[in-house]
Amino acid sequence: MSVNAATQVVVVSGLGGEPQYEERFSKWSEQVAKASASVTGDPAQVRRLSGDQARRENIEAALRAAAQGAHAGDRFVLVLLGHGSFDGTDYRFNIPGEDITGAGLKALLDRFPEGVTQLVVDATSASGAMAESLAGPHRIVIAATKSGERNASRFGGYWAEALNSSEADKDKDGSVSVQEAYDYATRKVAESFKSDAAIATEHSRLAGDDAGRFVVARLGAAALFANDAQLAAMRGQQEGIEQRINQLRAQKATLAEDDYYGKLEPVLVEMARLGQRIDARLAQLGVANGGRSDSRF
């Protein structure tokens, strides 16, 4: 993703029907929204709709605004938490007032400019009914359940947990990708049914490309790179230096050895000095960096 690319997130928690579900869905949406800000770098780019705010007109307005503000290379995330239903023809996300349909959501998502990569996490019951209709290029779709699975889904809670868990970060790079969060949530759902000695009533699915490269949360020091202006600027400089190093390496075969290393050395020194500045900034923020001078997240 380009250094200047933006990420927008909309998180919606629908009707619970019962107080325990209302509280549960609201809590999950709060956790997802908070973790998502570690990627956007700006909490204002995360829109959370919960309770009476989660009405169809507000969801539509949030998606239209996100589409208008998006450009090719950007990313957009939509997370739906709550109950869904499927009557054999239409999927519906249960919200205050008139429900929003799968067809309605697809029409709104299709308004985004070409080249915007989208992630849709539908963590509701019967969500599988919407998954196939949403499939398309530049779109990753996660459904918590199959279309005929109508029990309250557990997936959303474990998705929220994954975005805040170092356990989900399998490659230990300080970031949680879509694939890592999905694998974590899927595993935890299966373990929960096994622990309850119950038959699994939900089976999630993921469709789309580059799920391993789409970052949905940053952890620890990595989160600071999204939220601290100085670190974010230095990360941009770091990526620029890396590009120069890669360009020099690509020219190695065409350069005399002394000329190649003469050009490479000052760039490597520049990278090392920048790494020291990053480490110093992390120290100011009270974050240990494990002695790494490259500080790449």
What are these regions (language model features)?
Residues 24, 123, 227-234, 240-286:
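Alpha-helical, heptad-rich or low-complexity scaffold/stalk segments
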Residues 7-19, 44-45, 221-228:
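Acidic/histidine-rich, surface-exposed loop or edge segments in extracytoplasmic proteins
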Residues 31-74:
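Functional beta-strand-loop-alpha-helix junction segments that form "active/interaction loops"
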Residues 169-246:
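Caspase-like cysteine protease fold
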Residues 18-32:
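Glycine- and acidic-residue-enriched helix-capping/strand-helix junction motifs
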Residues 58, 83-113:
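A short, glycine/acidic-enriched catalytic loop
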Residues 30-33, 118-201:
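Active-site-proximal C-terminal subdomain of hydrolase catalytic domains
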